[in-house]
């Protein structure tokens, strides 16, 4: 079991910690929803222990704390859309790391190639679409998009009773 767990991806996420009461309002930040702090954590599921963490004001965006993670070659990282930064994603790929996240709905991508469901290990019942995609915009806001032209993989899976989940999975 330990060997199998060693192949699990690292998990990167944050959670707000609400702090209310006399004395807290003077020094804790308010993000419109929570007054308190935010814990950013990188977990290793193989050990069940945090690998890295930081505690910030509740107003700090998740992507601003991505620096707590030093990518390892061959490692896989899973994180949510709060860590959307195409240039950071390019750095992960350059370091030889992989990642899985959800693409934002406004991500400007084009499909390069469709993969037939018969190419999957399963019967295709849970995988609705498997595609290689490429970012089409050279600029991301006011800065260059270092993911432009790189091939990424987008997989859409079914979830009974819920909307399909679209995952973007990028390798090196």
For the regions a language model picked out, list residue spans one by one:
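Single, function-defining residue in the core of a domain
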Residues: 1-8, 12-26, 30-172
């Amino acid at each position: 079991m330990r060997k199998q767990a060693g192949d699990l991806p690292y998990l990167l996420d944050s959670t707000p910690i609400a702090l209310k009461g006399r004395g807290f309002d003077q020094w804790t930040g308010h993000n419109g929803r929570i007054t308190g702090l935010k814990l950013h954590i990188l977990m290793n599921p193989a050990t069940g222990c945090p690998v890295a963490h930081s505690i910030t004001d509740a107003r700090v965006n998740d992507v601003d704390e991505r620096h707590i993670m030093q990518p390892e070659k061959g490692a896989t990282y899973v994180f949510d859309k709060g860590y959307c930064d195409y240039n950071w994603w390019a750095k992960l790929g350059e370091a030889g790391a992989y990642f899985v996240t959800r693409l934002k709905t406004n991500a400007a991508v084009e499909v390069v190639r469709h993969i037939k469901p018969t190419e999957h290990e399963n019967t295709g019942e849970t995988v609705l679409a498997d595609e290689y995609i490429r970012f089409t915009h050279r600029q991301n806001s006011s800065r260059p998009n270092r993911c432009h032209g790189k091939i990424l993989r987008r997989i859409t899976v079914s979830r009974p009773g819920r909307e399909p989940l679209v995952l973007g999975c990028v390798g090196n």
